[in-house]
């Protein structure tokens, strides 16, 4: 007895196991995943309808890849287990009840994507099953045409049968682009294929015959055409003959051929060319073959016609040369313009130009086809590039949020290369190797600042680039101000010790040494050997003979240093102070270059220069005058500059007086002379009462002769300057304006999104726009109050007078006096 095996066991392929692992309810979910990966229709969809959705694998994929708060509806004959954010209906898609249920769920919305993965119960016969599936697809298309928005997508499953081509033709009537594809998840032995219809046209009227299976799948008998039907019965239109042309045989002379403006047209009309002129007939270019070709032009091919055109060009050049010689003999100047014009005509009428035109037309057609293909490829590449950039941005965000630790990602960052001792340069790296794989992750967490959200140090500037890119301009301004304040506080706390450059170089050399690589010789022996090899060259042969000169130079340098110290001591006695720098010179390479041994060399060089020029320029200037002095303790002392005198602010009369002094020497001299008068030595203002001096100012002071117009101009300038806001007020106004503009842009984007939404009614659009404007603060308008002056005898209640709209307030003279008295009381309180 044979062993019976289960059929379902053989169908459990890799997609079946993947569905089990990932939590999808069916392996067909990977079909939709692969279709979406190719066409990208789920990412932009806001509403989706899945027909024949059980058990819900496609609904799971749709809810995962569609935007948040999207509407997803699934319909099937059998119940579907609940899925988060998905509406499921148990209806038959071929009934009217299903349409009513969908209208109730969608209300005024239109869906962007309609999916159909339905198939009938198979098993009777292949012909019957294929027809049932095509009929089911036609019903799904009917629902899609009712609920799809313009430009929507329709993805359906179709069996390959004789009803496949009629279905494709119907799809092409409703959609701009129809493509048939078979995803990898679909089994090879299955007859199913998926048709992706893109760009729903949304016609105003649809003929019901499109959705009638009897009409749509009706077999059309193609009658065999007879031979008489294949032959065209239409006669060609008679073009006729030229006016006055009574013969069909045209004979022309050679001169007519040479004078013809268009030689190609001339050859198409001519039957024979007669060679009447003996000189042209006996020309060297006139061969026997050309003579025979001229006798019957209608039988010539392209090669012979081209030879005739080249022959014509040579004869025309010969005639042009002959005419020039005759003109010289008769002292007639032949215009070069006619010759150039003739050459242009020859170039235009050459057979090469006619052949090039045909080639150009073919090339243009090929170029157009290539351009279309390139445009499609570029669009596809842009789409893929955009997707890759989006994934990279998400990965950066995960790393910044510390969601991914280094070493966890699969990408090869160079850590998987072969181990080498050369790569370990410091003891810290050695400790990390000893700790294991997670040492780099711990080091990264230790390096991250935990106390402050914003890192001010220069070493972490690169880490803060991504943070700064996500902040608003206002927040960036606040961060920069905070950074400057922190740097100022750090400078005021104390002075950092300056390390000499030589010590820094020694430390760098010690850090660069590899702790795991041991040299064969000691360091001192190796340095001495390298030094002896370097100074053993011929260029340093006479350097020992100059030892006496080096001694003299050293003594002169010491003398110059003593003179400089005495100069600095004198300046200290005069009261010049030294100032400690706010910032460490180690942060600036230029200042660091002046410290340590390099400073001594620079001072020695400058002292020698000062000695050489001391006779001409006087005593040498101290080195620390501009750059500051570097003392042996390592601190840089900078002298304090003289305080800048505060400029005197002149009033309008003072500015007018200054303009008179600057423009005229005579007026300046007169003003100086007039300044000596009996009011020059008045008593000081502090000795007399204030009220007395204020009263006597206008009588005990001589008026300066100034132009009133000039004084008024300067007063107007002062008014304009005083009208300007201070810097803080201007910055505050600018920030407020920038916030308002930003809020306006956000509001405009939201309003445009609401207006462009097709799925809501106009009433809902207006309500949403009002809410947006109200939230932005644009709907609040300041009420205008109308003031009415009350007459005597008016009671407390006043009726609205005619012609006054809106809010009004009744005022009288008593109220005006009360307000004035209240203001006076407030001023007295302020004075106290």
From Swiss-Prot:
Listed Basic residues bias regions: 570-579, 822-832
GO BP: any one term: maturation of LSU-rRNA from tricistronic rRNA transcript (SSU-rRNA, 5.8S rRNA, LSU-rRNA)
Subcellular location per the Swiss-Prot or TrEMBL entry? Nucleus, Nucleolus
Q: Give start-end ranges for the coiled-coil region(s).
A: 726-758
Residues where S-adenosyl-L-methionine binds: 56, 58, 76, 92, 117
Q: Which SUPFAM superfamilies match?
A: S-adenosyl-L-methionine-dependent methyltransferases (SSF53335)
MF term (GO), any:
rRNA (guanine) methyltransferase activity
Its UniProt entry gives the catalysed reaction(s) as: a ribonucleotide in rRNA + S-adenosyl-L-methionine = a 2'-O-methylribonucleotide in rRNA + S-adenosyl-L-homocysteine + H(+)
What Pfam families does the entry give? Answer: DUF3381 (PF11861), FtsJ (PF01728), Spb1_C (PF07780)
E.C. number, please? 2.1.1.-
User: What is the main EC category here?
Assistant: transferase
* Region entry Disordered, spans: 332-358, 485-523, 546-631, 795-832
UniProt biased composition (Acidic residues): 503-514, 600-618
Q: Which domain of life is it from?
A: Eukaryota
Question: Which GO cellular component terms are attached?
Answer: nucleolus; preribosome, large subunit precursor; preribosome, small subunit precursor
List UniProt keywords, sorted A-Z: Coiled coil, Methyltransferase, Nucleus, Ribosome biogenesis, rRNA processing, S-adenosyl-L-methionine, Transferase
State the active site: 157 (proton acceptor)
The family this protein is said to belong to? Belongs to the class I-like SAM-binding methyltransferase superfamily. RNA methyltransferase RlmE family. SPB1 subfamily.
Cited HAMAP family: RNA_methyltr_E, RNA_methyltr_E_SPB1
The molecule here is called pre-rRNA 2'-O-ribose RNA methyltransferase FTSJ3
Species annotation: Gallus gallus (Chicken)
């Amino acid at each position: 007895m044979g062993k019976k095996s289960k059929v379902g066991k053989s169908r459990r392929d890799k997609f079946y196991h993947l569905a089990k692992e990932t939590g999808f309810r069916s392996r067909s979910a990977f079909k939709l995943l692969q279709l979406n990966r190719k066409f990208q229709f789920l990412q932009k969809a806001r509403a989706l309808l899945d027909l024949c959705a059980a058990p819900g694998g496609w609904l799971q994929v749709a809810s995962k890849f569609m935007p948040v708060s999207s509407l997803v509806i699934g319909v099937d004959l059998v119940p579907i287990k609940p899925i988060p954010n998905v509406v499921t209906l148990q209806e038959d898609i071929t009934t009217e009840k299903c349409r009513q249920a969908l209208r109730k769920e969608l209300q005024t919305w239109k869906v962007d994507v309609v999916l159909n993965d339905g198939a009938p119960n198979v098993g009777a016969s292949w012909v019957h099953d294929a027809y049932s599936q095509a009929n089911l697809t036609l019903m799904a298309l009917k629902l899609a045409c009712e609920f799809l928005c313009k430009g929507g997508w329709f993805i359906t499953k179709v069996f390959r049968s004789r009803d496949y081509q009629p279905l494709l033709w119907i799809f092409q009537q409703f959609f701009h682009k129809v493509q048939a594809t078979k995803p990898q998840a679909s089994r090879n032995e299955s007859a199913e294929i998926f048709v992706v219809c893109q760009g729903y046209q949304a016609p105003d009227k649809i003929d019901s015959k499109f959705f009638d299976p009897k009409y749509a799948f009706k077999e059309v008998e193609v009658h065999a055409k007879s031979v008489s039907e294949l032959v065209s019965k239409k006669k060609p239109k008679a073009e006729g003959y030229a006016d006055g042309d009574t013969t069909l045989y045209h004979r022309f002379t050679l001169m007519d051929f040479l004078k013809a403006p268009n030689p190609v047209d001339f050859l198409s009309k001519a039957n024979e060319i007669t060679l009447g002129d003996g000189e042209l007939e006996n020309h060297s270019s006139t061969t026997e073959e050309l003579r025979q070709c001229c006798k019957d032009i209608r039988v010539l091919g392209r090669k012979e016609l081209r030879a005739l055109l080249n022959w014509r060009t040579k004869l025309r050049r010969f005639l042009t040369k002959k005419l020039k010689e005759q003109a010289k003999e008769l002292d007639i100047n032949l215009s070069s313009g006619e010759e150039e014009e003739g050459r242009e005509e020859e170039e235009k009428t050459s057979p090469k130009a006619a052949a090039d035109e045909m080639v150009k037309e073919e090339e243009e057609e090929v170029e157009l086809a290539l351009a279309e293909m390139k445009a499609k490829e570029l669009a596809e590449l842009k789409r893929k590039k955009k997707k890759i950039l989006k994934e990279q941005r998400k990965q950066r965000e995960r790393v910044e949020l510390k969601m991914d630790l280094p070493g966890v990602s699969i990408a090869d960052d160079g850590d998987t290369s072969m181990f080498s001792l050369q790569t370990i340069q410091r003891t810290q790296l050695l400790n990390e190797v000893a700790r294991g794989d997670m040492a780099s992750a711990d080091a990264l967490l230790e390096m991250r600042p935990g106390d402050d959200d914003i890192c001010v140090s220069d070493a972490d500037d690169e880490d803060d680039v991504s943070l700064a890119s996500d902040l608003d301009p206002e927040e960036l301004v606040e961060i920069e101000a905070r950074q400057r304040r922190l740097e100022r506080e750090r400078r005021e706390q104390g002075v950092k010790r300056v390390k000499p450059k030589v010590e820094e170089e020694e430390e760098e050399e010690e850090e660069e040494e590899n702790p795991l690589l041991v040299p064969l010789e000691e360091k001192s022996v190796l340095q001495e050997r390298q030094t002896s090899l370097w100074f053993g060259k011929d260029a340093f042969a006479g350097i020992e003979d100059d030892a006496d000169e080096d001694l003299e130079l050293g003594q002169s340098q010491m003398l110059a240093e003593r003179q400089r110290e005495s100069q600095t001591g004198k300046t200290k006695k005069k009261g010049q102070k030294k100032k400690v720098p706010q910032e460490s010179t180690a942060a600036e390479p230029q200042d660091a270059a002046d410290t340590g041994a390099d400073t001594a060399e620079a001072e020695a060089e400058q002292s020698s220069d000062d000695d050489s020029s001391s006779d001409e320029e006087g005593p040498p200037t101290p080195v620390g005058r501009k750059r500051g002095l570097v003392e042996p303790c390592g601190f840089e002392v900078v002298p304090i500059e003289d305080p800048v005198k505060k400029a005197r602010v002149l009033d309008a009369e003072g500015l007018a007086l200054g303009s008179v002094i600057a423009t005229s020497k005579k007026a300046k001299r007169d003003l100086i002379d007039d300044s000596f008068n009996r009011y020059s030595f008045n008593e000081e203002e502090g000795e007399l009462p204030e009220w007395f001096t204020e009263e006597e100012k206008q009588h005990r002071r001589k008026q300066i002769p100034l132009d009133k117009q000039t004084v008024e101009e300067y007063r107007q300038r002062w008014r304009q300057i005083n009208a300007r806001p201070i810097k803080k007020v201007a910055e505050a106004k600018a920030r407020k304006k920038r916030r308002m503009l930003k809020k306006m842009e956000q509001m405009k984007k939201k309003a445009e999104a609401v207006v462009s939404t097709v799925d809501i009614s106009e009433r809902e659009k207006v309500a949403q726009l009002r809410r947006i404007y109200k939230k932005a603060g644009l709907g609040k308008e300041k009420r205008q109050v109308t003031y009415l002056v009350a007459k005597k005898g008016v009671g407390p209640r006043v009726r609205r007078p005619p012609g006054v709209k809106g809010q009004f307030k009744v005022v009288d003279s008593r109220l005006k006096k009360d307000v004035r008295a209240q203001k006076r009381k407030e001023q007295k309180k302020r004075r106290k």
